[in-house]
């Protein structure tokens, strides 16, 4: 009996002790603290609680983002548990008392949900590439991303209330509130701002993780030369105002690749260099990659430009008619099935040559340019899209004959066709495409000195199939991977006694994998690799591993430091022997011992952002291998290319400054580039490093625009460049002793422009006019080609009008 009583007593005493501990635990968690309005990191709040209540908080730091900022908006008294819930909003946790002064915080695994969707333009249904999407929770934490080339975005966040904001140049900001408790889809639509772009508005800006993005967008038009005319204001980019034959980072013209809806256009230029590369009225966006290349890109050393065509208005039928100095164009778009199936058709043609019969022979144009775009877009579901597009361009130089007929001396042709499917489901996005693209260059034998009535032709055609995926596993990690296969068929012509032609079939496949890791809110890393197999049927095969690396660190909200590395290889060589491209030019894939060109690009930079502007300082170093050049002593009417082609290596480096600032009525952009591009060849070993043909040590560019009112604006732009190296003297090859020694004088140019914009309800009007080279000393290339219609001293008037209804 006594034993039973003792046992019961001990049991009650144990319960009493447990109750006291539980009571003490509740007391610690429920003790009141006085909190004033303030903002601090999670770690600072933990330290403040420990100091105020003289306790120790125990937790696993790998499970909590201690650098996250938590803000208390008003002064109040609250319990420790209530304060912890504020500090750890979005986390599921429980507290346990370990001792009288030690409280354990245990994090229960946090559920992460995927918010995905497609950003489109209201009314037309156009998907928007590069829209900045942000989610802000109640603690003012922000998650952000950019919509991809299909307008698709994904954000991974825990359950909670969020404010969603979307911004895109030329569109009204979008905002809505969301409560996310499961994987969800949204399809925000953005309203365009009429005529938001000014005459000179090229932005090299960073939104989120994007580096060196050029994404113009306009409700009306990129009429005339808008698409490329101001690209030269970016540091490291030089070229003619029409966008033809531009150079990037000291590289040659053929080191740049243009992708039209993902399809390569092998020769985008036109005989009439006033004629812009593509029809701006049909273009939706443009992105220029130079320096860092995402792993999905390959094939060129200097730059890759993505140009996206519009999809066609899904709500109503719209027509855009444009007439400017080089061409007239018509773009038709509209729904076939509203909200589901849309069309886009664009046609352009030069018109100055139509008046040749009224002019004397020496003043005739004798050449014409024309192109077309056609596209069908079918929204199978809000998250699945099927697209088909076609593009064609023809340039022809002709002369009248005695029979008053036109003899075609030279003709360039481009053709591209593509079928593409894309979509997303939750955290997984996917796309597949098949395309065919071709380029041909045909010249009459008489133009090359042959006494024959026939044509000589060269070209390339390519068939490609590809598929790719991207996946977001959580808020910190994103992966993108894919595979491509292409079958290329080169038609090569030698300028020998018979202008012989040979066919070279080549297979190529590539695999890429890209990882994007956000280590914290200030530090992101992108690491990828592209593996390529290049397999000619008649020559040696090559296999290439191309790593890519990008590190971005933001020490503050207004500053970003970046470091990047890209290895690129190019399986194509091209040397043009005259002022225009001919089929007898040196075009050579990586066969017959001509190894692929390769480059390693290292770059570091700093960007500072301020209200409506930015300042950027950057520097790069780039190595090149297996480059080619024409020997000055060569007589190149020979079937043996190796008798006049030299191979060597090179390097380039640069320090660059870029500034832009916008005010209510003013806009200023300025860039300065100091750069050197050097090459070395065994044939000139005793000369050491020689400047390349694209070595431009100093380059200044600037633009100023003033907005008179909501409809009118003036602009002034200019450039000053060091002269290029001379490789031809009066159309004759220079002596070997002067090889790469002579340089042209300083080039400079000042342009002025005026823009008038007005909307009449559903009708929109844009008028542009101005003068290129009001004062200046333009390059010989510009005088011979671009300024074919000019006033005195190479001053070129331009004008254009667009009407949308």
Language model: regions and residue ranges:
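Short, acidic Ser/Thr/Gly-rich low-complexity loop/linker segments typical of extracellular
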Residues: 138-152
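Outer membrane beta-barrel strand-and-loop segments of large Gram-negative receptors
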Residues: 456-468, 502-512, 595, 601, ...
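Periplasmic N-terminal accessory/gating domains of Gram-negative outer-membrane beta-barrel systems
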Residues: 88, 146, 172, 187, ...
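Short, acidic, small-residue-rich periplasmic hinge/interaction motif at the N-terminus
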Residues: 20-22, 46, 52, 91, ...
